[in-house]
Amino acid sequence: MDSSEIEVVPLDSNSHQSPTESPTITDVFSASAYGDLHQLKHFVEHNGSSVSLPDDNGFYALQWAALNNSLHVAQYIIQHGGDVNSADNIQQTPLHWAAVKGSIDVADLLLQHGARIEAVDVNGFRAVHVASQYGQTAFVNHIIVDYAADYNALDIEGRSPLHWAAYNGFTETVRLLLFRDACQNRQDNTGCTPLHWAVIKENVEACTLLVHAGTKEELILKDNTGSTPLKLASDKGHRQLALFLSKAMRTRKNSFVDKIFCGKLGETSYAPMLFSLIVILMVLFITSIVSASNLPKITAMVGLWACFGLSCGVYALITFYRVSRKDPGYVKRTGEANSQHTANDPLIDINFKNPSWKGNWSQLCPTCKIIRPVRSKHCPTCKRCVEQFDHHCPWISNCVGKKNKRYFLVFVIMGALTSFVGGTTAVQRLWRGIPQVHHGESWIKHIVIEHPDAAVFLFFDLLIFIATMTLTISQSYMIARNITTNELWNAKRFSYLRGPDGRFYNPYNHGLRRNCTDFLVHGYTRDDEVVPSSIL
């Protein structure tokens, strides 16, 4: 995919010059490029230089001012005859140049003075194409919201802004365009969709966004060579992408199962298996351990412990049901919002020029069409965004999030306690009830031969104990630090988990005591941020 993108000439602003150095400013073009209004006025008012004529390369002073967002320089040029629609040798206007670095202030000025938002260059690129090529997400959103830029416009090769953002791997721009329902299945002159181009460049995150927000149609569309995105990934040796796309194809085929189980069992789900296993183990515990005819009569103390273990098992089943059925903290979709105005365009009231928004485009969910809380994540299995998303657990067929994490912790604790009490009781009963084994025969071998049902119980009981204890320890550790599994595993991807020095910093960690107290009292840890001491 050849691009005729604007060549960005590296320019150093005055702030980057050393005290003994100054930029070489020889004419209105260099003065505009460096944003030197004083020198520009000198050239125009004393030397009689024109700001409406191009230089030897066909570039205009207003283009240089637009490129570097020099607002006052751009205003001066316009006031002195600069044409906001002046086009260079490849028909690019100052607005095209403003799109390269996302110069929103100058773009506003140009458009307010009559610049054409849909002006095209020789390649058919509009400002929205150029901004998408350079990943200027805020600029793209700004011209869409305020100036109704066509974000599905095609260049001469039939490529939309989404094609370019996917090709160059600008996931934030991809996310914004998908959020605004940009067309995903549009094929360019080579038959490629945005997903094809994301696969060709092995942009994994862009592919993930496109697949989750798309339909089966984009997965099976073929380019002019007859290749689907999956075939392209396989042919180019992109194994990770090929596996992901193959799984997505299988998931889309389970639409009938999705409809029956509300989408939760469309992918691997072990909840019925786990529920059945717990019930079977409880029955085995009663028949092969507590009331086994080939073991001595149970004592009152051991019987009490057995009853306690069974009670824990019953409570574990109750919490299992509750954590499986309870809302994990689904974020309301756009259609569920109270404000009709916000529902029409939830981005319209946000000040994207505010520095606090920088880097937070990941809050947009192109599938749910919502601006989700910072710590939330879209679950492709549940097909919903979940607040304080921890992980999707196939063993409970549900996500673990803000509203059901306490139930999940209780469930794994009860599972660990039940398996510990049951296993301990079983070992005590077998140890006391089995006579001395023959020479050369191990105790375990004797158990397997003489009490196979008890051996099966102990085997699965041990597996459950190891799994639930691991989860209990890991969940307790993360609750104490007020961090989720998703954040812990993907910390490098989240800008809010980095301090001023660029190192890992958890702004939600209020200390062991408060974190645990909040969780016990409210059922979840709070999202109040702690300001790093280094910037206080």
UniProtKB/Swiss-Prot annotation:
Region: Disordered, residue numbers: 1-23
Per the Swiss-Prot or TrEMBL record, the active site comprises: C393
GO cellular component terms, semicolon-separated: Golgi apparatus; Golgi membrane
Pfam family name, one: Ank_2
Say yes or no: keyword NADP present. no
Q: Membrane spanning segments where?
A: 270-290, 298-318, 407-427, 454-474
What UniProt keywords apply to this chain's record, in alphabetical order?
Acyltransferase, ANK repeat, Golgi apparatus, Lipoprotein, Membrane, Palmitate, Repeat, Transferase, Transmembrane, Transmembrane helix
Locations listed in the record: Golgi apparatus membrane
Where in the numbering of this chain does the DHHC domain appear?
363-413
Note the Gene3D superfamilies from the entry. Ankyrin repeat-containing domain (1.25.40.20)
Q: What is its EC number?
A: 2.3.1.225
| Key word Transmembrane present | yes
- The enzyme class is transferase
Catalytic reaction equation(s): L-cysteinyl-[protein] + hexadecanoyl-CoA = S-hexadecanoyl-L-cysteinyl-[protein] + CoA
Question: So which residues are the signal peptide here?
Answer: none
Family, according to the entry, reads as follows: Belongs to the DHHC palmitoyltransferase family.
Physiological role: Palmitoyl acyltransferase.
Q: What is known of its domains?
A: The DHHC domain is required for palmitoyltransferase activity.
Q: Which PANTHER family match?
A: ANK_REP_REGION DOMAIN-CONTAINING PROTEIN-RELATED, PROTEIN S-ACYLTRANSFERASE 23-RELATED
Q: What is this protein called?
A: Probable protein S-acyltransferase 23
The organism of origin for this protein: Arabidopsis thaliana (Mouse-ear cress)
